[in-house]
Regions:
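Residue-level recognition of alpha-helical structural elements
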Residues: 130, 258, 276-278
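Alpha-helical coiled-coil heptad-repeat register
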Residues: 5, 252, 259, 263-266, ...
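ABC ATP-binding cassette signature C-motif
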Residues: 1-3, 13-255
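Alpha-helical coupling/stalk and coiled-coil linker elements that connect catalytic or binding modules
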Residues: 17-27, 266-278
Length: 278
C-alpha cells in the first residue's frame, strides 16, 4: 500500500535542525530521520525534477529509489547530501545524523596513499581498531588487498570497490548507494547483500539489479517523471514494482475510457449540430 505523503508549509533551506515530531502524529515518535517538505528543484525552467515533493524516511529503513532514466534519481541524492539546495521547500535531517555516499573517483592527491591511509582519512580522529574495520568492509565488497598497497597500484575495478567500502566504513546514519553492484561479480553482490541485510541504519539504493534489491529492501521511493513528485510504497521490491505496474495499467484504462467518452460526446454533438442545421 502507498504511504501517505506529508503536507507541510514550505521553507527555503537545507537544515539539520531537530525534527518537529508533533507534526508526525501518525508515525512512531522519533522514527523519522529525513524529510522533504514541499521541495521543488529544476536545472532549467522547462526541466523540473521535483515540484512541491513531500516524503519522509524512517530510521533503519532500507529503500529503493526508482524512476525513469533521466528522471533525476542522482539529483535526489545530491539534495539529500546538501550538494544541491532546493529552490523552494525544505529538507530536514535528524539532528546529528551523518550521511555517507560512495565517491565516483579517488581524488588525485590520494592516489599515493595506502589502503590503510585512505580509510583512516575518513575519520577525524585516529581509529585504533581500523584494521579490523577495513577487513570487514573489504569483505563486504569481496576484495582482498594488502592494507599497505598504494591506491595507484590498484586496478580500476579494485578502486571502485575501495570507494564503495569507504562509504561503508564510517557506518553513516543515512547510507546512499548509487548502482553499487556495477563493479561487483556475483560473489561480491552476495557479500554486499549480506552486509546490507545486517546494516542497522538507514539505506537508500539506486540500482537496476532487481534480485539484489529484493533481498534486503522493504520499501520503494518512486520518482514520477510526469508529476515530479515522489510516491512511497511499503513492501519488497518485486511486489511494489508489480503494484506500480498495475496502477499504471489502471490509469491507462481509465484514460482510455475518458478519451472514448469524449469522442462519443463529440460524435453526438456533431450529429445533432448537422441535424439541426437541415
Amino acid at each position: 500500500m502507498r504511504r501517505a505523503a506529508l503536507a507541510l508549509s514550505p521553507q527555503s533551506s537545507y537544515t539539520s535542525e531537530p525534527l518537529d515530531f508533533s507534526l508526525l502524529s501518525f508515525m512512531d515518535h522519533g522514527d523519522v530521520i529525513l524529510r522533504f517538505s514541499d521541495v521543488s528543484f529544476s536545472y532549467t525552467h522547462n526541466k523540473p525534477i521535483l515540484k512541491e515533493a513531500n516524503f519522509s524516511i524512517r530510521e533503519k529503513a532500507k529503500l529503493t529509489l526508482i524512476g525513469q532514466n533521466g528522471a533525476g534519481k542522482s539529483t535526489i541524492f545530491k539534495l539529500i547530501t546538501g550538494v544541491l539546495s532546493p529552490q523552494s521547500g525544505s529538507i530536514h535531517k535528524r539532528h546529528g545524523a551523518t550521511i555517507g555516499i560512495a565517491k565516483q573517483v579517488i581524488p588525485h592527491h590520494e592516489l599515493d596513499c595506502s589502503v590503510h591511509q585512505f580509510f583512516q582519512s575518513s575519520f577525524t580522529e585516529k581509529k585504533y581498531d581500523l584494521t579490523r574495520d577495513i577487513d570487514r568492509v573489504l569483505d563486504a565488497v569481496n576484495l582482498s588487498v594488502p592494507h599497505d598497497k598504494l591506491l595507484n597500484d590498484l586496478s580500476g575495478g579494485q578502486k571502485a570497490r575501495i570507494l564503495l567500502a569507504n562509504a561503508l566504513i564510517t557506518e553513516p546514519d543515512i547510507l546512499l548507494l548509487d548502482e553499487p553492484t556495477n563493479n561487483l561479480d556475483q560473489q561480491g553482490i552476495d557479500h554486499l547483500t549480506s552486509f546490507l541485510m545486517g546494516y542497522e541504519k538507514t539505506c537508500i539504493v539506486i540500482s537496476h539489479d532487481s534480485a539484489f534489491l529484493n533481498c534486503f529492501t522493504h520499501g520503494v521511493l518512486n520518482l514520477d517523471a510526469f508529476t515530479h513528485t515522489i510516491q512511497q510504497y511499503v513492501g519488497d521490491y518485486y511486489d511494489v514494482v508489480a503494484e506500480i505496474a498495475a496502477q499504471i495499467e489502471r490509469e491507462q484504462q481509465q484514460n482510455a475510457r475518458m478519451e472514448k467518452s469524449i469522442q462519443d460526446r463529440k460524435v453526438k454533438i456533431n450529429f445533432f449540430s448537422h441535424k439541426g442545421g437541415k
